[in-house]
Amino acid sequence: MRRPNGMIAILTGAGISAESGISTFRDQNGLWENHRVEDVCTPAAFLKQPTVVQRFYNERRRALLSPEVKPNASHQALARLQREYKDGQVVIITQNIDDLHERAGSRQVLHMHGELLKVRCTATGRVFESREDVIHGESKCECCGVVETLRPHIVWFNEMPLYMDVIDEVVQNAGLFVAVGTSGNVYPAAGLVMIAKAHGAETLELNLEPSGNCRDFDRSVYGPASVIVPAWADEVLHGKGPAA
């Protein structure tokens, strides 16, 4: 396969952060406080039980900010690739709501499912950084001064992912599309590889195991993200073997 030519679009999923110590918050029965996580992460759930939903995200936010959670070698490798790749842009499209790409030094990151360390005003749509707990009925919005208007800046089930116009443009103009740590089962993210191929891009899957759409990729490499992603980045930057 040919080496990357021009823009590289990289889609990352939960697998890239799995080695960074982020908890899933599910017990052995797949529940959180006797709730299915899928039942907490919906607009209807927020309307019905906002206190419960805020508590769920407060716990996740505190866990993300704990000292033991930090970027791993795969995040660092992608940040280095963004800094050092000379033949075009490297754009990261992530399904993850953590900030580990940014902590590793990446700058061009499109969070299609939102960001855990941000909140959004339901009255104005404005988005704010937030590292503190959000208490329903107490936490006051910065822009409107009203309590009960803040919600997590997260794309819930039945909501449209963010930045899709930009993401489509990036994928359509990429010379190489790479998916790292994705399940291949969540759309529209899982459909991006076929958009890239339709516009002439080479495609590569880097994953712990075959994803749900692994057959859509031209080439696949399997193993821990902290091992295979740095190795691939070295291939791109220093010509050590096939890059795509």
UniProtKB/Swiss-Prot annotation:
Q: In this entry, which stretches build a coiled coil?
A: none
Residues reported in the UniProt entry to bind NAD(+): 13-32, 95-98, 181-183, 225
Q: What is this protein called?
A: NAD-dependent protein deacylase SIR2rp3
Keywords for the protein's UniProt record, in alphabetical order: Metal-binding, Mitochondrion, NAD, Transferase, Zinc
> Which top-rank group of organisms is this from?
Eukaryota
CDD domains the UniProt entry points to: SIRT5_Af1_CobB (cd01412)
- Enumerate the residues binding substrate: 57, 60
Known InterPro entries for this protein?
DHS-like_NAD/FAD-binding_dom (IPR029035), NAD-dep_sirtuin_deacylases (IPR050134), Sirtuin (IPR003000), Sirtuin_cat_small_dom_sf (IPR026591), Sirtuin_class_III (IPR027546), Ssirtuin_cat_dom (IPR026590)
Per its record, the protein catalyses: N(6)-malonyl-L-lysyl-[protein] + NAD(+) + H2O = 2''-O-malonyl-ADP-D-ribose + nicotinamide + L-lysyl-[protein]; N(6)-succinyl-L-lysyl-[protein] + NAD(+) + H2O = 2''-O-succinyl-ADP-D-ribose + nicotinamide + L-lysyl-[protein]; N(6)-glutaryl-L-lysyl-[protein] + NAD(+) + H2O = 2''-O-glutaryl-ADP-D-ribose + nicotinamide + L-lysyl-[protein]
- Domain (Deacetylase sirtuin-type) spans 1-239
Stated role: NAD-dependent lysine demalonylase, desuccinylase and deglutarylase that specifically removes malonyl, succinyl and glutaryl groups on target proteins. Has weak NAD-dependent protein deacetylase activity; however this activity may not be physiologically relevant in vivo.
Q: Which Gene3D superfamilies match?
A: SIR2/SIRT2 'Small Domain (3.30.1600.10), TPP-binding domain (3.40.50.1220)
Extra facts = This protein may be expected to contain an N-terminal transit peptide but none has been predicted.
> How does the cofactor bind to this protein, according to its record?
Binds 1 zinc ion per subunit.
A molecular function annotated in GO for this UniProt entry is: protein-malonyllysine demalonylase activity
Check the record and name the NCBIfam families matching this protein.
PRK00481.1-5
Q: Cite a GO CC annotation.
A: mitochondrion
Main localization of the protein described in the UniProt heading: mitochondrion
* Domain comment (free text): In contrast to class I sirtuins, class III sirtuins have only weak deacetylase activity. Difference in substrate specificity is probably due to a larger hydrophobic pocket with 2 residues (Tyr-57 and Arg-60) that bind to malonylated and succinylated substrates and define the specificity.
Catalytic residues identified in the record: 113
Q: Where in the cell does this protein reside?
A: Mitochondrion
Originating organism = Trypanosoma brucei brucei (strain 927/4 GUTat10.1)
GO BP annotations listed: post-transcriptional regulation of gene expression
Question: Which enzyme class?
Answer: transferase
Positions that bind Zn(2+)? 121, 141
Q: Which family does it belong to?
A: Belongs to the sirtuin family. Class III subfamily.
